[in-house]
Amino acid sequence: AFAEAAVDQVEPIFRSGLGAQPARFKGQGDFATEVDLVIEQQLRDILTQMTGIPVYGEESGGSVLDTVWVVDPIDGTANYSAGNPLAGILVALIHKGAPVVAVSDFPLLGRRLVTCDGSPLRSVGGPATGFGGGEDAMGFDEARGHVGCSSHLPTEIFHELRETGLRPRMTGSVGLDNAFVAQGVFDGAINFSPHPWDNAAGALQIQTAGGVVTDPEGNPWTAQSRGLVAGTPQVHATIVDILSRHSGSFHR
């Protein structure tokens, strides 16, 4: 409830700032807008005041303590700055290295996913989940094989994914890729981000929906993992198998 209330308060800032220009460059084409900075500070203030738990944010730092909030004020900043609506707000509570509360909000798409450990996934906008359900459920289609991935994916891995029949898709937002897996829009996702604010929310949401979530080597995902592979059992296994043959090309 605290995480969702905090997101509710910053969502109007997110909506009104679409197209904001870079304000801080972080290297290798990465940057933050003034909206990133404002939203993160507000999330930090709100969550700390409400819960007393420290916040680890993309723009202002922190550390992965025993219990900590991790926030990405704008996941997909390059999209957002260009006026592309494929961007969102990610908030997760990590306890002993694992996410236990998660909110992924995509205001410009009208989609939000919310869950906490032990509770079902709540999905607003789009299908609730592709896992389980009856024959008529909006679901994962392993024959379709859509896999969210980033432009940092090595070329040889990209091509091998295609050769197995999977279909890589690049949204420009790690958080959206993960949310799409939880909703059943994508059948899998892969990224090599070492940052917990990118993957913590999605990891919990996909697991809650019944998907498989690991690091790129196939180990359980934790806040210290350097990347994430997720999806249906079949798609996840296919991706991990491909990565096992190319491990030297994605360790950064």
PLM regions with names:
Residues P120-S123, A128, Q234-T238:
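Short helix-loop capping/hinge motifs at secondary-structure junctions, enriched
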Residues E58, D105, F192:
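Conserved residues at the C-terminal ends of beta-strands
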